[in-house]
C-alpha cells in the first residue's frame, strides 16, 4: 500500500530531530527548473500569485534565492519532520521509532509543488509553492502541466518496488490532481472523514486534515498492507461506517462531543 498525503504551508526547522538518517529527493532536476522560474518573481508578484502578505512574500522570495541543489543536513531537513500543518499534527512523526520511519519510507509519499514526490526521509529545503499556483514555466501555464506524468511515473515505481497495487489517497484534491489515475497502476482507496455538527455529518476541514494524519499514523504503526485493514481505524473517536462507504471510498464518522 502506498499512502499519499499533501505537504503543509507551516514548516519547522528548529525542533530537535528524532532521526539522523536521510535520503535525497529524486526529482531535484525538476525542482531546480521551478526555482529558476520562481526567482524571476518580485515579492509583490509572489504576494499576488500566492495570495499571501507582503511579509510572507519577502520570506519566500528569500527562500527561492537561497535554495541550492546541494542538500545537506545543515541546510535541509527530512520532509516528514519539516512539515507542520494539521495533517502532520495527526501524524506525529516526531514520535516515530526507527522501524516506523523504515515502514513510512517505503509506504508514504508526500506530494509537493516544488519537489513533485517526497519520501519521508528526503531532505527538503524550506519553500512555499502550492500545487494549484499558476506559475508559468517552460512546460506550460501551471504546475500541473509542469509535472505532467512525472509524479504518476514516480508513484508507479514505488508501487512496483513494494509489489503492490493499492494507493490510499489521503491528499487534498489540489494535490491529487497532479496524479493521473488512469495511468496509475493501482486501485485507489479514498478515506473520507465526517464530523457531526448540529446533528449532521459533514467534512470539517481542520478535523478532516488531522484525521488524514491520524490514518497515516494508524497504517504505519500497525504495518498495514491491505485496504480492508483500514476499517479498524478508531483514533480519536472515529468509526467506520460501512453503509455510507463504497468500493473506492471508506467513510469514517465521529459524533459531536456533548
UniProtKB/Swiss-Prot annotation:
GO cellular component entries: cytosol
Superkingdom: Bacteria
Pfam families found in the cross-reference section: H2O2_YaaD (PF03883)
Record-linked InterPro entries: YaaA
GO biological process, one term: response to hydroperoxide
Similarity comment: Belongs to the UPF0246 family.
Name of the protein in question: UPF0246 protein YaaA
The gene coding this protein: yaaA
